[in-house]
C-alpha cells in the first residue's frame, strides 16, 4: 500500500514537473529518484562537472597541454548536450538555463571547429617526427628546430602556426565562462587564482 502511494505521488510529481527522475543505470538497483525540480537538478549537475574543469575558466599556455584542453572542452560540449535534455523549456527558469547552455554549446562548437583539427594534425606531425621547426633563425639564417621530446610543452605550443589566434579564442572562452557561466551556475572560480 505504501509503495503504491509513493509510486502515485512520484508519478504525479513528475507530471507536474515538481520532481525529476534520473535513471543512473537500467537495473533494479540503479533507479535514483531525485526530489528536485529540473532547473535545480541541471544546475547542480553542470556545477559539479565544471567545478573541476580549470582550463575552461583559466588557461596557462606554459603548463596546459592544448591537446588535453581540447579534450576537456569536447567533454564539456558533450556533457552539456546530454544534460540539457532534463530541462523543460516551458518553464521560465529552465528556459533561462537552456539559453545559457545553448550559448555555451555555440561558443565551444565554434572554437573546436575552428582550431581543434588543425592543432591536432600539427601536434601529431611534430610528435611523430620528434621535431618542431621554429621561425627563429640560427647564425646561418636557417630555421632553428627543437627536439619535441626534450622540449617543455609550453615552448612547443608557442610554435604552432596559429598560436596567437588560438590563445585569443581560448581567452574569449575563458572570459565567457568566468563572467557568465560561473555566475549562473554558482561556480567558485577564485580557487584557480590560488
Region annotations inferred by a language model:
Residues 53-61, 80-91, 115-126:
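Secondary-structure edge/capping motif, primarily at the C-terminal ends of alpha-helices
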Residues 66-84, 100, 107, 111:
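Short, contiguous, well-structured surface segments enriched in hydrophobic/aromatic residues
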Residues 78-97, 147-161:
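Short, charged/polar, low-complexity loop and linker segments
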Residues 100, 104-194:
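Soluble C-terminal extramembrane regulatory/interaction domains of multi-pass membrane proteins
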